[in-house]
Amino acid sequence: MDLHSAIRKSKYFGFGVSPSCTGNVRKPEFFAFLAQTKLGAITLSDIPSSTFSWYTGEFYESQSITLELGKVARFGENDHKLLQPTFDAISELISIDGYKDIEFDESDIDIYKSTRTLFKKTNDFHFTFDAGVPNFTFFEKGIHLASDNGQEYYAAEGGEAVVFPNPNVQIGHRTCMLMQPTQIKIVNNQVMKS
C-alpha cells in the first residue's frame, strides 16, 4: 500500500487507486480488506502508471493500491479519528492472528472505472472548469472539460467524474483521470469492472 494525503478536497475522505497490472492484483479478499478501512471509493485504473503500487503489482504481483487518505494539512490539523478505521484494518492485517476471512461486498464501497486519462500535449492545455474542484466532481455528458491546442475534450456518455485534475504538469504527463461508477464481477479470483 502506498499511503498519501490528497492535495485537494474530495467527495470521499479516503479513496484508493487500484493499478492496472498484468498479474492478479485485485483479489476479492484484498478488496474486502479495503472495505474494512472505510474508504469511500476505489478506482480501477486501466493503464500502467509510474506509481509505487503499479510497480510492486506489475513486477511482484503483490496486492497493491495507492490510498489517498484525507487532505494535506499542517501538522496536527487533520482529524485523526477519521483515519482510525484504516489504522484498525491495517493493524489487524499485520497482527499475529492475521486478518479475518471476510467476503467482499461491493455495496460497502463505491467502485469507479477509469474511462480515460487526459495527457498534456502542448502548453496550451487548460481545463474549462476550476482546476481546484474536489476529486470526483461529476460532469454530465457533453460538458466541455478541457482544450489542448484545438483538441477539445467533453464528458462522455453517462457523464464522468474527474480525479487528480492538474493542468500544470509537464508536456506528456497526466492532467487528470476521468471515471464513472461501475459494477464489478469476479473473474479468475480477480475483481474486474463489469
Enumerate the language-model features and the residues they cover:
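Structured catalytic-domain cores with a bias toward divalent-metal coordination
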Residues: 2-194
